[in-house]
A protein has these predicted regions:
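Catalytic alpha/beta core domains of metabolic enzymes, predominantly
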Residues: 1-128, 134-137, 144-149
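Carbohydrate-binding surfaces of carbohydrate-active enzymes
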Residues: 146-159
Length: 164
């Protein structure tokens, strides 16, 4: 399921969802528009990880080739495999290159703008990654967020709201 419109976010909120994960392809302007249309809805935004050659929630290659649904969190990352490009005459134009692999998303320098646009939490891709990768990426984002929180008291860490 990809969530990229205010109407879809509003529908999910009214159906009982209490946070909505937005499609990773959205721009700052699109995130802000959704937030302005649905200010009561907490919005989770992808900030780090793979970008799909398809739109989020619209890839069926993994399911067709490997029986693993990307739309259920089981992407086989077919687009990350090397391919050769051969013309109609059989001539190899490109051999064993990552033709479908996009650059990974890294929004670490845009965290403050994402907060200003209405993001309430951030999603770092960790599925199918090893523990040290997830630990290091999360720590780097944590440092950047802590620096923002120190400068911008209007942003409060969710954990600081929990009282035991």
């Amino acid at each position: 399921m990809d969530n990229r419109t205010p109407e879809k976010v509003k529908f999910l909120w009214e159906a009982g969802f209490r946070q909505v994960v937005l499609a990773r392809e959205l721009s700052l302007r699109e995130i802000k528009k959704i937030h302005e249309s649905c200010p009561e809805v907490p919005l989770e935004v992808f900030v780090h990880g793979a970008l799909c050659v398809s739109y989020s929630g619209q890839c069926y290659v993994s399911q067709a080739c490997f029986g693993r649904s990307a739309n259920r969190g089981e992407c086989a990352q077919f687009c990350r495999l090397p391919f050769s490009l051969v013309d109609a005459d059989g001539k190899v134009i490109v051999k064993d290159k990552h033709l479908l692999s996009l650059k990974d998303m890294n929004q670490s320098d845009e965290l403050e703008q994402l907060l200003d646009a209405g993001a309430s939490s951030f999603k770092i891709e960790g599925r199918l990654k090893d523990v040290s990768y997830v630990k290091n990426v999360t720590a780097a984002y944590r440092q950047k967020l802590d620096a923002i929180f120190a400068r911008r008291p209007e942003y409060v860490r969710a954990l600081s709201l929990i009282h035991i």
